[in-house]
């Protein structure tokens, strides 16, 4: 399908990641991205300013949630495993990582303008 073409590499993002997004961003709307992740790629613990929803079109991924315990992060429950056809929801500000267990195609919807905050999770 043509919808999965024209993905681009975005500077300062994890290896194995390409995306296609909506432009321009409506500050009161949603950002929608079509993401492709290679098997074995991952995202470090981070959070987003708004709620997000990921729909797995192809592949399998794992999301681990974390909470702060003083100066360090500790796992918050078991990893959430998302397979083809599954959708996952993450509240804004919730710390999580992501691991791509298979090649993945995702539709990612973020409330308001997308943001990635790794600084908020570190001391």
Residue ranges, per PLM feature:
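A short, N-terminal "cap"/entry segment at the start of jelly-roll beta-barrel domains
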Residues: 1-34, 44, 79-80, 123
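Double-stranded beta-helix
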Residues: 4-7, 27-30, 95-123
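Short, conserved beta-strand element in jelly-roll/cupin
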Residues: 36-38, 48-69
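Tight coil/turn sites that cap or link beta-strands
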Residues: 38-40, 84-85, 91-93, 103
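Short acidic-glycine-tyrosine-enriched beta hairpin
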Residues: 68-92
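Conserved hydrophobic/aromatic beta-strand scaffold that supports enzyme active sites
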Residues: 32-36, 53, 79, 87-89
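Short beta-strand His + acidic residue motifs that chelate non-heme Fe in jelly-roll/DSBH
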Residues: 43-45, 63-64, 90, 95-101, ...
């Amino acid at each position: 399908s043509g919808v999965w073409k024209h993905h681009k590499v975005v500077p300062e993002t994890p290896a194995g990641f390409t995306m296609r997004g909506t432009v321009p961003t409506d500050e009161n709307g949603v950002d929608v991205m079509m993401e492709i992740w290679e098997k074995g790629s991952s995202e470090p613990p981070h959070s987003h300013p708004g709620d997000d929803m990921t729909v797995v079109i192809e592949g399998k991924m794992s999301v681990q949630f974390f909470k702060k315990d003083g100066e360090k992060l500790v796992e918050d429950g078991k990893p959430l495993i998302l397979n083809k056809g599954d959708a996952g929801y993450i509240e804004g500000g919730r710390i999580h990582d992501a691991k791509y267990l298979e090649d993945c195609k995702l539709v990612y919807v973020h409330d308001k303008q997308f943001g990635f905050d790794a600084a908020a999770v570190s001391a």
